[in-house]
């Protein structure tokens, strides 16, 4: 089985409401750009991966750059190769475009998806087997000017079954403490609280804020 084509599908996914955080490059968004990658083989089996083009800490990726990296650098290296030699292929990509992690993630996911389809097993079987029957997930609450709106978002997530609430922080530490207090008082010990400043705080300010958040029992 050989790789014969790599397909890239750009998407722009709109948010239902604006999403605000403290990331230095982009504090508020109305949508997110994603790239779906499908790897095709000569046996008709294909695998799908996905990545984001999000200008935030650790990444300045845009869709065009992701597509060009995959089409112009990755695809020539992958064509004719066995998609089952995953570690070898990823090492080739890393050497050709060092630290292009977002593009590489989509290709890597597609290779694992393809291999799992070929062997007729879930991907976790290729990664050493199942560790647990389910995985708990959380919901992220955007920074809002209206505190009640943040509580309402968290309540909506709770009603949908989420028990881990992650609040965005880092723009105004005083507001962060007020929100943490309000959400903890609203839910009591029914949820676990987490916080994410998206690189919006330096080390000294982060320590000061964390100290103030201690009474609200963050994970």
Protein language model regions, located:
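Cleft-lining beta-strand/loop regions that shape enzyme active-site pockets
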Residues: 219
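N-terminal capping/lid subdomain adjacent to the active-site entrance of alpha/beta enzymes
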Residues: 1-194, 198-207, 211-216
